From Swiss-Prot:
Residues 1-20 form the signal peptide. This is Ig lambda-1 chain V region. Residues 21-117 form the Ig-like domain. PROSITE patterns: IG_LIKE (PS50835). The modification Pyrrolidone carboxylic acid is found at Q21. The keyword Signal applies. Coiled coil: none annotated. Transmembrane segments: none annotated. GO terms for cellular component: immunoglobulin complex; plasma membrane. It comes from Mus musculus (Mouse). InterPro entries: Ig-like_dom (IPR007110), Ig-like_dom_sf (IPR036179), Ig-like_fold (IPR013783), Ig_sub (IPR003599), Ig_V-set (IPR013106), IgV_Light_Chain (IPR050150).
Amino acid sequence: MAWISLILSLLALSSGGAISQAVVTQESALTTSPGETVTLTCRSSTGAVTTSNYANWVQEKPDHLFTGLIGGTNNRAPGVPARFSGSLIGDKAALTITGAQTEDEAIYFCALWYSNH
């Protein structure tokens, strides 16, 4: 049985304020099997993640190729397979991979936008 390792990293983007004011947390690592559905989540220390945080998800493959998957919480980038979807679950941003494939093994970054305006 093949396993897919999904490693998660953090990124917070700020506008008009200090980036250190917000801490973004995710699961440190997840493993799943091909064909399974997996959901990665991203939480903010400043409160609930909302559509105003414009959650973005980026994938980094082992060869250091970066691909933007989701922008603005739930907008899939052109050319990204339909198995990737973004949403809000409770107070967190989420990336769901429905029917994970072996080629989905990667590091996934969550980026949130913060604004004092």
